[in-house]
Amino acid sequence: EYKRNMPGRIIGWSKDKYGKLCYRMALQTREQHIKREKATSNICTAQALLATMAGFYAVYHGQEGITTIASRIHSITVFLDKQLKKFGYTQVNAQYFDTLRFELPEHVSAQQIRTIALSKEVNLRYFENGNVGFSIDETTDVAAANVLLSIFAIAAGKDYQKVDDIPEKSNIDKTVKRTTPFLTHEVFNKYHTETEMMRYIKRLDRKDISLAQSMISLGSCTMKLNAAAEMLPLSRPEFMGMHPLVPEDQAEGYRELIKNLSEDLKVITGFAGVSLQPNSGAAGEYAGLRVIRAYLESIGQGHRNKVLIPASAHGTNPASAIQAGFVTVTCACDEQGNVEMADLRVKAEENKDELAALMITYPSTHGIFETEIKEICDIIHACGAQVYMDGANMNAQVGLTNPGFIGADVCHLNLHKTFASPHGGGGPGVGPICVAEHLVPFLPGHGIFGNSQNQVSAAPFGSAGILPITYGYIRMMGAEGLTQATKIAILNANYLATCLKDTYGVVYRGANGFVGHEMILECRKVHEEAGISENDIAKRLMDYGYHAPTLSFPVHGTLMIEPTESESLAELDNFVDVMLNIWKEIQEVKNGEADKDDNVLINAPHPEYEIVSDRWEHSYTREKAAYPIESVRDNKFWINVARVDNTLGDRKLLPTRYGTFE
């Protein structure tokens, strides 16, 4: 009943054309890139990478392992509860699993406990009312339990006896105790040795195409290299073992990294303040709009509630504006993909008394450097409103220009795009916001610092664990390297545009005839003349070993391509060869040389099981389907399923039984 109201991504079952079950992203038309201001949420970054890690944990341990771990955690918690009560502490949680909270005896203070705990290198939770608490997890062993005992015993002036073992005990009331089985699917009951688990993960890995195989040309996504040197800190416990709420003097290294990174981002954006708190670009948009609202309220302009957004903007812009409590007003774009200046002036004038902000992307979502960008900012400022710059395309700005110079007041950055932290598989994302001087006082705070204004994340610095990646990227590249990367990103996009302009054609170009860091390939004429859609081209690319570009965004019936600076000339040339060979295949359909109802494009992709089948009833050869050009032979990536039935997947979102569509 409510499936279309669910936020974020939904993965559901469907079947390919041969009846093989498969997964796909379902009900995509309900998401913000289609629904825009009518979307349920602005969520883009699903953080699926973290969910995958948790999933592997459950797969490896299974029901029995998880139960054993949980029982051990709870037993230690029960033991500590009983022992601390003997010391005069009162445990206030009637029902608990792993977390205890104690009222202290009259002669014991929280500061006493804090002093003793710190001397033993233990951090506890200290509540405002003087209570003290802690949580147990699977890393807590008998030795750690003895340390906790000693802290509370010493504070209370009690003797304590070290224990060598803790018996299995339960204090969970039967009314809330689970009795039904869980993790019953076969995947949670097969891979309980490291060898089997390793092979299972590798089998899954072989089904995914990634930058390890070839360029991922997704427009507006900036799928660049995540260099090994930048990733190394993620394996260091000094970074990964840090709790986000530890005392400041225990995180001096992190604080220095955060300070230096923030200073770097200020210089890069031309702004005066930074918050690293937002956990995604969409969260950054929301946070930035909250900052604008807080500023307007502070100067008596809190009635301003309208946000002007170009029609070309990414769908998260209007979705975030709605989430932040604003009303959106759409501004038209001209035939060249630029903001229609006449319409902008009219909309700004009509709404000037209520206008809070303009949200604009630069270069535009059409991949164009709009020459009027500074004039656009001036028009908005003249109305008393602020300019929010979407930093999704910052990869075409770094070192050449910046939002501050252009005239924006706030922007977000996608560290998982422009600044090289992992992007595929759902993040984890970081979407810091950078602001001009007058907005600095309204940046997100956090309760740990005694100021929770505009807080958008549970942790004060968001996903701080992956900040070392961006820090390493910026420091190793330096100003000259970052600028060169921007130039190469723009050069690569224009190289592809030049190579493909005489076949497919490029939808938009800037005033000087060039594109920005990405370009939109025209596919609508192909569909009219040959009956081949942009979807067919994207599916056929899989046979050549390439991930699909961005389909039908921001223009329906097109493909948006962004090569990034990471790709070599050899890889760009190979991609061009592939696209030109697909163009040749399209012409074969158009000219009647290939069957319009049975050709390599409308039947793509061709999985291995189809190619090796005894049954082959197509009008073209197996070789043409699987090895259309010589370069594919050296690095063939076999797609796992044939073309998927999208309608079935949306209509039958969940099977009634596992593996069936009855």
Residue ranges and their predicted role:
Residues E1, C44, A48-L50, I216-M223, ...:
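FAD-binding core of FAD-dependent oxidoreductases
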Residues E1-C22, L84, R101-F102, T115, ...:
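Conserved PLP-enzyme active-site core in the AAT-like
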Residues H61, L218, S280-A283, Q336, ...:
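Short glycine-rich loop/turn motifs that provide flexible caps or phosphate-binding loops at active sites
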Residues G133, M215, A357, G384-Y388, ...:
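Structural preference for beta-strand elements that scaffold enzyme active sites
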